[in-house]
A protein has these predicted regions:
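B-type heme-binding environments
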Residues: 1-153, 157-159
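Non-transmembrane catalytic domains and loops of membrane-associated enzymes and transporters
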Residues: 123, 127-559
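Conserved small/polar residues in nucleotide/adenosyl-binding loops
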Residues: 565-572
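Membrane-interface recognition of transmembrane alpha-helix starts
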Residues: 69-87, 543-564
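A short, sequence-level motif marking secondary-structure junctions
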Residues: 4-8, 299-301, 566
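Generic hydrophobic/packing signal
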Residues: 21-38, 45-71, 191, 231, ...
Length: 575
């Protein structure tokens, strides 16, 4: 409350070109609608110079304070304090739970699981798992070529002398009914999917070497490389498919592959695609055992051969090559020629039919996986059969390349050890990064006599393989952030299963090193985040109630993401 009587007595005449004096005299003019006890706050806040003079006027002419607040000021303060309490409470809760998860929860997941007992709780021997895959015609152990009938023409059968030098030649093949969960033990069959586009020799070789060096039995893991089209990276002398094939020691039983047709996730003329399947082993140049390896090269239809980027259909299509294959294997559905060729060659390489694979590790071609990472992720899956997806910590490989990479180090650390760790407490990690994540292909039922499809469930495959993308919402989900949308689909389809973060599993990847590249990446990420959080808001079965629920956390994340770049400093308006 200000008393301007002393001011008017001192300055009897108006001061020219003084906005503060003008406001005061307008307030006390006879033509004004204000009375002596009216609120003149709005008059002073309209003009910037008058607003800046408020502290000085309060110091010289303050007569007292109003002993009550107006309704507007009271509601503004109420909303402010409630928001402050909720936000600070959420931040502190996230931090405390993340610390607990780092020292207690995650260690339980990463610990070595107990060996599977041969007897159930009732004392009865567990039944042998049923063979839920009817092998296609010719997919028997008598077919030593391991390829489809239409691809056997012109293949040279190796002589007995040369066959002795082939990798894993002494592995005895097992029929699906000859192994039990006890025989598999704590080393389930895992396929490591590596999606490539335009990476060079150094990047792909580093990724394959890191997967080969993981502390996991070589006869229980399969490196599955998908080259997305006939692409040659900038500054590279070899195309990406040639690089992938050159790093593999081919299995002479298969000869020269034949292009096989499959249905891609594109539409129109690109709805059909063809791919070559190379099979063999990867041998790390630094030593170690050879690992079974399959390279799928998407070469395109014959009419694409003369064009640029023949066979290129995107990363989602590369993922669908594997996911669709295992869906057909799990559900015993009719197979495409490409699926059939994959079935034969994987069967011959691994010694078991592909239905034995339970998990898939998805990595990018520029990611280096630490040796214990695969084991830690597999342990988490075995310790809790409700887990359908898990990710590890992604660290920056080129953190000292520029100031742009350096500023991302702390952000990556917080996003994993606070955000993902907090979400993992409730089993609801909303985003498993596409560069390093593991998904469960199928889960064992309690009786060990059947399986529950997880990532290959028909609902997930149908939505993730949409070919007609028209709306802006669909484009942001399927074209800009397909990796995050896959996590959203998993949570929406299986709200009572878990998605976790395993900090013990570590990988290194390269991040954008220029500001232009970083802004382009973050624009895609923000668009994808907003649209995926909107999808998660519709999932009503997430754990918790009201403010103590994952749905409320998702809402807060959505509001924060939308307001992050539109927020501005609040006006210093006195109330």
């Amino acid at each position: 409350m200000l008393n301007f009587n002393a001011y008017l007595a001192t300055y009897t005449k108006p001061i020219p070109n003084d906005p503060v004096d003008k406001v005061i005299r307008n307030f006390f003019s006879p033509s004004s609608n204000y009375t002596d006890m009216s609120d003149a706050t709005r008059l002073f806040t309209i003009d910037k110079l008058a607003r800046d003079a408020i502290p000085c006027l309060k110091q010289r002419y303050q007569a007292g304070r109003v002993n009550y607040k107006t309704t507007g000021c009271f509601m503004a303060d109420l909303i402010l304090y409630i928001s402050l309490i909720v936000i600070l409470g959420l931040v502190f809760a996230r931090t405390i739970m993340a610390v607990w998860y780092a020292f207690v929860g995650s260690r339980r997941l990463a610990s070595t699981p107990p060996p599977p007992g041969k007897f159930s709780a009732t004392g009865m021997r567990r039944p042998r798992p049923k063979s839920h895959v009817a092998m296609p015609d010719g997919a028997t152990h008598e077919n030593s070529m391991g390829v489809a009938p239409w691809a056997q023409k012109g293949i040279v059968t190796p002589t007995p002398a040369s066959s002795k030098n082939l990798p894993n030649n002494n592995v005895s093949l097992m029929t699906p009914a000859s192994m039990t969960p006890e025989d598999i033990g704590n080393d389930p069959y895992i396929v490591c999917l590596v999606t490539c586009y335009s990476e060079g020799l150094d990047g792909i070789s580093a990724t394959l070497s890191s997967l080969s060096a993981t502390e996991y039995p070589t006869n229980r893991k399969l490196i599955f490389v998908v080259a997305d089209g006939m692409i040659t990276g900038k500054g590279e002398s070899m195309s990406t498919p040639d690089v992938c094939v050159s790093l593999m020691t081919p299995d002479m039983r298969f000869g020269t592959p034949t292009p096989m047709k499959y249905r891609s996730v594109s539409s129109g003329k690109k709805a059909q695609n063809m791919a070559l399947v190379y099979a063999g082993h990867y041998q790390d140049p630094s030593g170690g055992e050879s690992v079974p390896m399959v390279v799928v090269v998407k070469c395109g239809m014959p009419e694409e051969a003369a064009g640029q980027k023949a066979g290129n259909r995107g990363k989602r299509d590369s993922q669908m090559v594997l996911m669709s294959f295992f869906q057909h294997v799990t559900y015993n559905d009719p197979m495409s020629p490409l699926d059939y060729d994959l079935f034969r060659k994987i069967h011959a390489l691994m010694g078991v039919t592909p239905d034995f694979f339970e998990m898939v590790l998805m990595v990018d071609a520029d990611t280096k996986v630490h040796p214990p990472a695969l084991r830690y992720l597999a342990n988490a899956m075995l310790n809790d059969h409700r887990i359908m997806g898990a990710c590890g910590e992604t660290r920056i490989q080129n953190k000292l390349q520029s100031w742009v990479t350096a500023i991302q180090v702390f952000e990556y650390f917080i996003s994993h050890h606070q955000v993902k760790a907090f979400e993992a407490v409730f089993g609801g990690v909303t985003c498993l990064p596409g560069c390093f994540s593991m998904y469960r292909i199928k889960a064992r039922k309690p009786g060990f006599d059947d399986w529950i499809p997880v990532i290959v469930k028909q609902d997930i495959i149908r939505e993730y393989s949409q070919t007609i993308v028209t709306t802006l919402h669909q484009k942001n989900l399927l074209l800009l952030g397909e990796d995050r949308f896959l996590s959203t689909l998993m949570l929406r389809t299986f709200p009572h299963r878990r998605m976790v973060f395993v900090p013990h599993a570590v990988c290194h990847t390269e991040v954008p090193h220029t500001l232009r590249m970083l802004l382009s990446q973050r624009r895609r990420w923000i668009n994808s985040t907003v649209h995926n959080l909107m999808e998660l808001l519709l999932v009503r079965d997430l754990c918790g109630t009201f403010c103590f629920s994952m749905q409320f956390v998702v809402l807060m994340d959505l509001i924060g993401t939308c307001l992050l770049y539109t927020s501005d400093a609040a006006d210093d308006t006195p109330c």
